[in-house]
UniProtKB/Swiss-Prot annotation:
NCBIfam families: PRK06075.1. Gene3D superfamilies: Cytochrome-c3 Hydrogenase, chain B. NDH-1 is composed of 14 different subunits. Subunits NuoB, C, D, E, F, and G constitute the peripheral sector of the complex. It is a peripheral membrane protein. Belongs to the complex I 49 kDa subunit family. Its EC number is 7.1.1.-. InterPro entries: NADH_Q_OxRdtase_suD, NDH1_su_D/H, NiFe-Hase_large. It holds the Pfam family Complex1_49kDa. The gene is nuoD. GO terms for molecular function: NAD binding; NADH:ubiquinone reductase (non-electrogenic) activity; quinone binding. This is NADH-quinone oxidoreductase subunit D. It is found in: Cell inner membrane. It comes from Chlorobium phaeovibrioides (strain DSM 265 / 1930). The keyword Lipoprotein does not apply. NDH-1 shuttles electrons from NADH, via FMN and iron-sulfur (Fe-S) centers, to quinones in the respiratory chain. The immediate electron acceptor for the enzyme in this species is believed to be a menaquinone. Couples the redox reaction to proton translocation (for every two electrons transferred, four hydrogen ions are translocated across the cytoplasmic membrane), and thus conserves the redox energy in a proton gradient.
C-alpha cells in the first residue's frame, strides 16, 4: 500500500497489484469561485454582466448587473412633445421597433380618446406582425449559435432580410422606423405592398416549418435545452413574466387575446403553449417552441388583415393625427404584445404641457431577466448560456 499526500485536498491511497493501479479512497474538497460573464462575452446578448457564484461546474447563484446601455429614456420623455417620443421607443427594443411604437401610441391615443381610421389599424397590425416574425427569427437564429449550430442562423437571417426589405419599402427604414404616429401613420403603404406581403407569406410558410424541424428534431439541440432552466407557471406569474416566456411555462396569456387592442378582436389566431410532448413545460426548449409556433400565427394574422383591409381611395394616413398633442389632466396605462412580452407605458399628463409629466416604460425584458437567479440555481455553466439565450432579452429595452 502506498499513500500520496495531496496539498489541501486530503490524501490519495493507491494499491499496486502487478501493473494495475486501483484507487481505494479519494478525499477531495471544493470551494466556491466567483465567475464574471460579460459585459463583453460571447454568451451574453448585448452589454450584460453576470456575476456567477460557482461550485466547480455548478452555478449556485447568478446576479445580473445592468445599466451599461442606460440612456435616460424616461427623463428625456419629460422634455419633448408626445409625438417626438415615438423615435425614442424604436431605440428601446431595436429588433422590434414597430411593436414598441404601437405600444406607446396605444397609450397616448387612450389618453386622448382618439378614434383611429380602420385602414390605419390594419396596416399597423400587418407591419407589427412582420416585425414580430423578424424578431423571432433573430431570437431563433442567435439561440442556435449560442448552442453551437451555425446553419439555422443563416436560414433565419436569409428570410429576415425579405421582411426588412418590405418594411424598408413601406416605412423608409430597416430598423428604426418612426412609422406609427399618434393618431395615424407616417405614410400609407406603397402600391403593390399587399401583393408582395402575400407572396412572402406563401414563400415563408414552408420555410418556417423547415426551420422548426431543423432544431426541434436535432438531438444535440434538444439535449442542450430540454429540462434546462425550468420555470413553473406560478413562479413565472409571481415574477410578472409575459409573452413567450410566460406561455413557455404553460400559461395561455396574450394581450392581443386577453386585453385586445387595435383590430385584434376581429382576427382569428391561436395562442400556442407547450403540450409537454417535445419538452418539459417551462424549460428552455418550451420557450423556443413557443416562438417558433408564433411565427405561423403571425402569418395567419397578416393574411386576414390583407383580406379585410379597406381600400385606398381618398385615404389620408394622417387624417386623425392631432396638430398639437395636449391631453387633458389624467393618467393612463397602455400596453401591447411585443415579441418579448408585454410592453406598457404609464403616462401622466398635467393638462397644460405638450410633454408628459411622467412617462414610465414597463419593459418585458427587464422583468424576464429578474428571474435569472431562480433559473440558474443548480445549473451547469454551459447550461447558463442556454438559459440566457432562451430569455431573448434586448439590453436596449432593459436599460433604457
Amino acid at each position: 500500500m502506498q499513500e500520496l499526500e495531496m496539498a489541501g485536498q486530503g490524501s490519495l491511497r493507491l494499491s499496486r497489484k502487478s501493473d494495475t493501479i486501483v484507487v481505494l479512497e479519494k478525499d477531495l474538497s471544493t470551494e466556491q469561485m466567483v465567475l464574471s460573464m460579460g459585459p463583453q462575452h460571447p454568451s451574453t446578448h448585448g452589454v450584460l454582466r453576470l456575476e456567477c457564484l460557482t461550485d466547480g461546474e455548478v452555478v449556485t447563484e447568478a446576479e445580473p448587473y445592468l445599466g451599461y446601455l442606460h440612456r435616460c429614456f424616461e427623463k428625456h420623455c419629460e422634455h419633448v412633445d408626445y409625438p417626438a417620443i415615438v423615435p425614442y421607443t424604436d431605440r428601446m427594443d431595436y429588433l422590434a421597433g414597430i411593436n414598441s411604437e404601437m405600444a406607446y401610441c396605444v397609450a397616448v391615443e387612450k389618453l386622448l380618446d382618439l378614434e383611429i381610421p380602420r385602414r390605419v389599424e390594419f396596416i399597423r397590425v400587418i407591419v407589427s406582425e412582420l416585425n414580430r416574425i423578424a424578431s423571432h427569427l433573430v431570437a431563433i437564429g442567435t439561440y442556435a449559435i449560442d448552442l453551437g449550430a451555425f446553419t439555422p442562423f443563416l436560414f433565419c437571417f436569409r428570410d429576415r432580410e425579405h421582411i426588412l426589405n418590405m418594411l424598408e419599402w413601406a416605412t423608409g427604414a430597416r430598423m428604426l422606423y418612426n412609422y406609427i404616429w399618434v393618431g395615424g401613420l407616417a405614410y400609407d403603404v406603397p402600391a403593390g405592398f399587399n401583393e408582395r406581403v402575400l407572396e412572402f407569406v406563401n414563400y415563408f410558410r414552408p420555410k418556417a416549418l423547415e426551420l422548426q424541424q431543423l432544431l426541434t428534431e436535432n438531438e444535440i439541440f434538444v439535449k442542450r435545452t430540454k429540462g434546462i432552466g425550468i420555470m413553473p407557471a406560478d413562479v413565472a406569474i409571481n415574477y410578472g413574466w409575459s409573452g413567450p416566456m410566460l406561455r413557455g411555462s404553460g400559461v395561455q396569456w396574450d394581450i392581443r387575446r386577453n386585453d385586445p387592442y387595435s383590430i385584434y378582436p376581429e382576427l382569428d389566431f391561436a395562442v400556442p403553449v407547450p403540450d409537454g410532448k417535445l419538452s418539459v413545460v417551462g424549460d428552455c426548449l418550451s420557450r423556443h417552441l413557443v416562438r417558433a409556433l408564433e411565427i405561423e400565427e403571425s402569418l395567419k394574422i397578416i393574411e386576414q388583415c390583407i383580406d379585410k383591409m379597406p381600400g385606398t381611395q381618398g385615404f389620408d394616413p394622417r387624417s386623425a393625427v392631432p396638430k398639437r398633442v395636449r391631453p387633458k389632466a389624467g393618467e393612463v396605462y397602455g400596453r401591447a404584445e411585443n415579441p418579448r412580452g408585454e410592453l406598457g407605458f404609464y403616462i401622466q399628463s398635467d393638462g397644460k404641457s405638450t410633454s408628459p409629466l411622467r412617462c414610465k416604460a414597463r419593459s418585458s425584458c427587464f422583468v424576464n431577466l429578474s428571474a435569472m437567479k431562480d433559473l440558474s440555481r443548480g445549473q451547469l455553466i454551459p447550461d447558463l448560456v442556454a438559459i440566457i439565450g432562451s430569455l431573448d432579452i434586448v439590453l436596449g429595452e432593459v436599460d433604457r
